Amino acid sequence: MKAVTLSFVTFLIARGLSAQPQVYALSGSVSDSATGKPIGAVSVFLDGTSKGTTTHDDGAFFLAGIPAGGYQLIISAIGYANFQTVLNTSQLPSNLHVTLHREATELAAVTVEPDSKNGWNKWGGTFWDYFMGTGDNASSCTIENKDVLRFHYYRKSKRLVVSAGEPLIIINNALGYSIEYRLGAFSYDFSNGQLHFYGSVFFRAMTPTYNGQQRVWESARQRAYLCSVTHFMRSLYQGRIKQEGFFILHQVKKPNTEKERVKAIYDPGIAGTGGISSDSLRYYRKVLREPDYFVHTINNYDTLLTVNADRTRSFSFTGVFTVGYANAQLGIPNTSSSMELTYPASVRIEENGSYSPLQVLLWRGAWAKTETVANYIPNDYTPPPLP
């Protein structure tokens, strides 16, 4: 994403009664960096939420009902480079004004190969399975403007790259959301099965078309939320892992130091020549049959969390976390996922369950299959109380 300058006028309004969660509002304006003129019809939204608005003709906007926490603010207009920045309701800046820059027309030569002809017919199924998913929710979704997708297949590296010049408009009839997804990148490597995609997403709740449809949506949303990474991160933030139905096993690989010691002193050439006692020989051979590493399980995960001054939580770990979830009352069977860090880093969790950096966590198991767009729930979603 192109770099842009930031200078937008923002006012924070905190409101709410003690019996209700505190919410905030954000106001400001957007103008053209070259002319200084206000820009109307600009999309202003908090990434991953249903909180968004558009600017008026005078460039002004007002975004209300923001729950406490940290968010990525996205400001997007056709013909301009997108703007994004991290905001936290506890530390919002004041007296700022956003200026957007005209987007330069860049040649697509960097793709090396031209768009695949009949790209959707050739690669649409692959893209759908890894982007939208393969479950029941995915089968109830449609991409309204799939013609904006561009597919590039690189034969030498066996890699599929997909891009979109406009936000994807996705209708999720299973969960009752209309979604705008601004695709940042999508690539799938057929040689090793490695998938990478990211983007910004904005949700709009759909209007029911028949009696009872809202109840169906609410039930489906609750189920999707309970089985999600967002639910796990919120539970971890609140220290309610067990109460929310999760269990965690933290597995750490530790080297077999005794095997390393025996390797250093054991010489197969003198074994059986009388230079080593039979008891020692049996012991050495037993140790050498052991694995190079032992896996230790750590059940105390509370000590991994650090409370930060801005109300976020941070955690870092080595090894592999196995996360399980089940809810018998709602008919959700046992599922198991694992997560590990792709590089040494600290994962930062917001109160709403969002976390960063996204690319630092590698998921395997259930979440590797279900954390797709068809199962996405807004970060500002509030589930009903569990029975």
Language-model segment annotations:
Residues 24-26, 33-48:
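Short, ordered, surface-exposed loop/turn motifs in non-cytosolic proteins
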Residues 26-32, 59-61, 98, 110:
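A short, amphipathic beta-strand motif
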Residues 37-40, 62-70, 384-386:
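Short Pro-Gly-centered beta-turn/loop motif in secreted/extracellular proteins
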Residues 42-46, 73, 112:
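Hydrophobic beta-strand segments
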Residues 46, 74-86:
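A short, solvent-exposed loop/turn motif at the edges and junctions
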Residues 49-60:
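Short, acidic Ser/Thr/Gly-rich low-complexity loop/linker segments typical of extracellular
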Residues 53, 81-96:
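Structured interaction patches on ligand/partner-binding surfaces of diverse proteins
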Residues 99-387:
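Surface-exposed, low-complexity/disordered segments
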